[in-house]
A protein has these predicted regions:
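Short coil/turn linking the two alpha-helices of tandem helical-hairpin repeats
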Residues: 97-100, 111-114, 121, 131-134, ...
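A cross-kingdom marker for long, charged
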Residues: 222-223, 234-302
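Amphipathic alpha-helices of TPR/Sel1-like and other helical repeat/solenoid scaffolds
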Residues: 190-203, 244-251
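Soluble non-cytosolic domains of exported or imported proteins
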Residues: 180-191, 204-211, 238-242, 258
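Short solvent-exposed coil/turn linkers within tandem alpha-helical repeat scaffolds
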Residues: 152-160, 200-212, 251-262
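N-terminal Sec/ER secretory leader and immediately downstream segment
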Residues: 32-146
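Sec-dependent bacterial lipoprotein signal peptides
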Residues: 1-13
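Bacterial signal peptide processing site
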Residues: 16-19
Length: 302
């Protein structure tokens, strides 16, 4: 995923109230950010390049985060508290863009600057203190959003629905979802994510950030039923991949009462009728349920 695509995801989920991805070596997966008490962030860098500007960009940002937390706690567990969080998150994402700009500039000028272990560790620590994860995809570095940070910062301040949303996303973020349009989790785990977000929607029908939860459900369901460019549901010969078929059958047996499983069951019926090959009937069924193809689409990485 290139930087433009990555920024689009975060912008999409901000404007419609959803999530961000942006874009150092390929297939590198970030560990969870350390707990705040364990962080000893550097006051400055001396790389002689754009990275040296990042500490000054973040100066005072933790105070802004603390103020937002206090403001949310003053109206704890209400929609107003969620609004405080979402408003601060918009500022957070704009800061992330500025940091990502510096990372992009630094690696274009000093190609190996982030290969220095000490610099990379210091930068990871500095970003983690303010809720950013130093993440990589397809050779590009970016400042990603750490949802686990939000759960700590706004612990006890948000509505149950928002707290649940952030916990779910923090858990999902700990496992890379895709890289280079190839699925990084199993088909069964992908199905489980779709079911989880369906259950979330049922449990919290009045969730104030529905566009975000809907985005994740649609992304997982669409990927499950249409695949990705480098993780296809149909083989080169045109038949359903055996592991995908096994996952579909497992989902239908495990969660028969869910809308997700019921749709998959209908797909299986149509597939069986056509020798487990794609058909116009399946395309029509998916269209009726607003399932769009993920082929030719850059999926989120985390």
């Amino acid at each position: 995923m290139n930087r433009a695509s990555a920024l689009l995801f975060l912008a999409l989920l901000t404007c419609t109230k959803g999530e961000r991805a942006t874009n150092v070596p390929k297939d590198s997966i970030q560990s969870r950010a350390p707990e705040p008490a364990a962080l000893v962030a550097p006051d400055s860098f001396s790389t002689g390049g754009p990275l040296d500007e990042i500490p000054s960009l973040l100066a005072g940002f933790d105070s802004q985060a603390g103020a937002a937390r206090q403001q949310a706690r003053a109206v704890a567990a209400t929609p107003a508290a969620d609004s405080v969080f979402l408003s601060f998150r918009e500022r957070f994402l704009k800061m992330g863009e500025q940091i990502t700009d510096r990372l992009e500039q630094a690696t274009s000028i000093q190609a190996t600057v982030l290969e220095d272990t000490a610099t990379s560790r210091q930068l990871t620590t500095l970003l983690a203190k303010d809720g950013f994860a130093l993440a990589y995809t397809e050779g590009n570095a970016y400042a990603d959003e750490d949802n686990a940070y939000w759960t700590r910062l706004f612990d006890g301040a948000l509505t149950p629905a928002m707290q649940r949303y952030l916990r779910l996303r923090a858990t999902e973020q700990s496992r890379r979802f895709s890289e280079d349009a190839a699925l990084q989790i199993s088909w069964d785990e992908l199905a489980g994510r779709a079911v989880t977000w369906e259950q979330f929607a049922d449990s919290y029908p009045d969730f104030s950030w529905k566009d975000a939860s809907r985005f994740w459900y649609n992304t997982y369901l669409s990927t499950y039923l249409t695949g990705m460019d480098n993780s296809r549901v149909f083989s080169d010969s045109g038949t359903l991949e055996p592991e995908v078929r096994a996952s579909y059958e497992h989902l239908v047996a495990q969660y028969p009462q869910t809308r997700t499983a019921q749709l998959v069951a209908q797909c299986l019926t149509l597939l069986k009728q056509n020798g487990y090959r794609p058909s116009a009937a399946i395309d029509s069924l998916l269209q009726q349920h607003n399932v769009t193809s993920m082929l030719g689409v850059q999926p989120p990485t985390r």
